[in-house]
Design a protein with these regions (language model features):
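Eukaryote-biased, non-catalytic alpha-solenoid scaffold regions
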Residues: 1-12, 20-24, 31-190
Length: 190
């Protein structure tokens, strides 16, 4: 007879908690049961240390390609308190705002000492940005931002690595290396 895995107990209320409620509950459990804190920390490190650069690349490429072009009507043209904002400037700002959470995640991992994960995150972001240089559809935020926007965003990734005192990933493709490190003191790690 085949041995089955133990069944997870039914937890209908837990299953319906929001992300915030789950976070609060985890905090309460760790206070009530400090003996599980070390295991929770180990699991957290394990989760944050694992980054799939290809998945990051796909995610950021999709996010930037699917940016909501309708926002341009609110952010370009005459804007109260800013004067006239060109459509390419507004589009670049939208893309920068979409990239920022990923940059924050890269910095978070670097600050935790998870340098390989931060490098893989950077590699994925750079690959995704490079992919966005091709086959840009007219009428998208990427198209309105102009052909240099992905290079500008790649410099943001490079700058975050530099601030974290990290080198570019070893497996950075040469075409990305030329674009991102031109004129930079950063070199791929040996």
């Amino acid at each position: 007879m085949a041995r089955s895995l133990p069944r997870r107990p039914s937890t209908p209320t837990l299953d319906r908690l929001t992300t915030d409620e789950r976070g609060q509950l985890l905090g309460e459990l760790l206070v009530a049961h400090p003996e599980v804190a070390a295991e929770a920390e180990r699991l957290a490190v394990s989760r944050l240390a694992t980054v799939d650069a290809d998945e990051v690349a796909e995610d950021i490429e999709w996010t930037l390609r699917e940016a909501d072009a309708d926002q341009l009507s609110y952010r370009a043209g005459r804007v109260r308190g800013r004067g006239y904002v060109h459509v390419d400037e507004a589009a670049g700002e939208i893309l920068q705002e979409l990239l920022q959470p990923e940059l924050d995640d890269l910095v978070r991992r670097a600050d935790l000492g998870l340098h390989d994960a931060a490098r893989q995150m950077a590699l994925g972001l750079l690959r995704g940005l490079a992919n966005c240089q091709h086959d840009v559809e007219a009428g998208t935020v990427l198209a309105y931002a102009g052909p240099d926007v992905t290079d500008d965003l790649a410099w943001c990734v490079r700058d975050e690595l530099a601030e974290a005192h990290l080198d570019l990933p070893e497996d950075l493709p040469e075409d990305l290396l030329e674009d991102v490190s031109a004129g930079s003191d950063l070199e791929p790690e040996a």
